[in-house]
Structures are given as structure tokens and as C-alpha cells.
């Protein structure tokens, strides 16, 4: 990833926020996101910093050692695309072994440089469902059937 000083300030702020995200830092979400920000990922679609904060609170409750690593960031003061990996452990998934989800986020910024739209793109079937004991076998079977 380019050095943070080469990126537009809103991008640098959001990258720093995600790479240092913790239960304790969730209180800073309003510094990075607009009050009426829209957030969408494969499981959630919400508006506002309160609901966005609750998504991350649930993440910290359900997962062990969740951490984002931004691999690439491109954009300007109005929009950005981040390519990232998300590392975590879940005692109910694959015996609690480390897991990784690869994805990308599309961000749009308001006039104050805060995130007004955050859209995550990642393959829930490949990155998550295929790792679940019963569902995983079915997903892999379906994938093979569709591929031929």
C-alpha cells in the first residue's frame, strides 16, 4: 500500500481507524463516519453511526482477535476503494483455528471528509459458509455441480 502521506486525508483517517479498530476505539467511529452514513455488507444494511457501531460491537462479542489489514487503498477526497483482509478466530468455526476473509470496500466521503457510504464486497459463500461443518459440504457440492 502507498505510504499514508500519499493518500487523501479522509482515506488515511479511515485506514488508520480500521487497522487499529478495537472495542475501546469504537467511540471514535463518529470522527470517521457521518451521522447518517449508510453501511452495507453481505449480512447488514444500516444507516447511522449507532447501528454501524452495534455491528462492530457484535463482531467483538462473537469473534476472537478480529483485525483488519488494508492491503491497498486508492481514491481521492470524495471516494476510495480499500482492499483488505480480515483475520479472526471463532471457537465454533474450524476448531477455533485462525480464519481470514478477503474483501474490498467502496467508500464515499461527505464535504467534511467523513464516510457517507460504506459498501463491503466479499464472498460469504467461499469465505465463510464453505467452512461451516454441515453447510460447507453442501456449498462445496453445489460449487462443483455448477462448475461442470
Q: Predicted regions span which residues?
A:
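Short, low-complexity N-terminal intrinsically disordered segments enriched in polar/charged residues
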Residues: 1-27, 31, 145-148
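Soluble or luminal CAZymes and related metallo-dependent hydrolases
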Residues: 9, 13, 51, 99
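Charged/polar, solvent-exposed surface patches and flexible loops
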Residues: 13-16, 31, 54, 58-61, ...
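Hydrophobic alpha-helical core bundles mediating ligand binding, dimerization, or RNAP-core interactions
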Residues: 14, 18, 33, 56, ...
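General structural signal for alpha-helix termini and helix-helix connectors
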Residues: 16, 20, 38-39, 91
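A solvent-exposed, acidic/Ser-Thr-rich amphipathic alpha-helical stretch
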Residues: 26-80
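A beta-strand edge to alpha-helix "cap/lid" segment located at domain peripheries
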Residues: 61-67, 71-148
Amino acid at each position: 500500500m502507498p505510504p499514508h502521506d500519499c493518500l487523501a486525508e479522509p482515506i488515511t483517517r479511515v485506514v488508520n481507524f480500521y487497522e487499529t479498530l478495537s472495542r475501546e476505539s469504537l467511540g471514535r467511529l463518529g470522527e470517521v463516519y457521518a451521522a447518517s452514513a449508510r453501511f452495507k455488507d453481505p449480512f447488514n444494511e444500516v444507516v447511522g453511526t449507532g447501528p454501524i457501531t452495534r455491528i462492530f460491537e457484535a463482531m467483538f462479542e462473537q469473534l476472537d482477535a478480529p483485525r483488519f489489514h488494508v492491503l491497498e487503498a486508492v481514491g481521492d477526497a470524495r471516494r476510495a476503494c480499500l482492499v483488505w483482509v480480515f483475520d479472526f478466530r471463532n471457537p465454533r468455526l474450524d476448531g477455533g483455528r485462525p480464519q481470514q476473509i478477503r474483501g474490498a470496500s467502496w467508500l464515499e466521503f461527505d464535504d467534511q471528509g467523513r464516510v457517507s457510504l460504506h459498501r463491503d464486497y466479499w464472498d460469504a459463500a467461499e469465505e465463510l459458509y464453505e467452512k461451516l461443518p454441515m453447510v460447507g459440504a453442501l456449498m462445496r457440492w453445489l460449487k462443483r455441480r455448477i462448475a461442470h
